[in-house]
A protein has these predicted regions:
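Alpha-solenoid helical repeat architecture
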Residues: 1, 28-41, 54, 70-85, ...
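Generic serine detector
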Residues: 2, 11, 33, 61-62, ...
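Tandem amphipathic alpha-helical repeat scaffolds
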Residues: 2-10, 38-52, 83-95, 125-136, ...
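Generic ordered-secondary-structure signal
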Residues: 10, 20, 64, 95-97, ...
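Alpha-helical repeat scaffolds
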Residues: 11-27, 52-70, 98-112, 139-151
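Alpha-helical adaptor scaffolds
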Residues: 48-49, 53, 71-121, 132, ...
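C-terminal non-catalytic interaction modules
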Residues: 126-127, 131-176
Length: 176
């Protein structure tokens, strides 16, 4: 509930006590439980779209380095939360133009989707990959391939609205 409150109100007061009490413990761990992931997700909502000082961003950055390996040690039922935490992390890294860690997160998401056989977020993952290829690697051909795959997966899951939004986003990115 705290995560939803933070997201809806853009106030970082919701869940602050939880973070104050538990985040340092989570930060020191090598393997995360489902509760740890929920605390991390709350933390990510606290720092998303906000200016953060170097210490807070350092905590985030060190957490991100542990995320790709978590899919190997977690129960398959918990991978959906890990997937969402990784997607949010990619957004934060991209917004801060901190691109170095993103490829390993992409790889982890691909593995999670394969292990769970849940491809609902595959169009979004491919959208992020095309943006990475276009803006970071300056590789238009690879970006085009990810765009086509994103569109295909959105059609396969029957989400016409998502197909439309993906095409709109591609048109905007293509103008750059």
């Amino acid at each position: 509930q705290s995560t939803i409150d933070v997201f809806e109100t853009r106030s970082n007061q919701f869940g602050k006590e939880i973070l104050d009490d538990y985040f340092e413990q989570v930060h020191r761990k090598e393997k995360y439980s489902i509760n740890d992931l929920l605390i991390i997700r709350l933390y990510l909502e606290h720092i998303r779209d906000r200016d953060t000082d170097a210490t807070i961003y350092h905590y985030f950055s060190s957490l991100v380095t542990h995320l790709p390996n978590q899919q190997e040690v977690m129960d398959s039922k918990e991978l959906f939360i890990l997937r969402d935490v990784i997607l949010i992390s990619i957004g934060i890294l991209g917004d801060r133009e901190d691109y170095e860690k993103i490829p390993s997160l992409f790889d982890a998401l691909d593995k999670i989707m394969f292990l769970t056989q849940d491809f609902q977020k595959k169009p979004i993952l491919n959208l992020l990959k095309w943006k990475y290829e276009l803006h970071v690697n300056k590789n238009r051909d690879a970006a085009q391939s990810y765009f086509e795959e994103a569109t295909l997966f959105a059609k396969l899951i029957g989400n016409d609205y998502l197909v439309h939004k993906i095409k709109e986003d591609w048109e905007e990115d293509s103008r750059l």
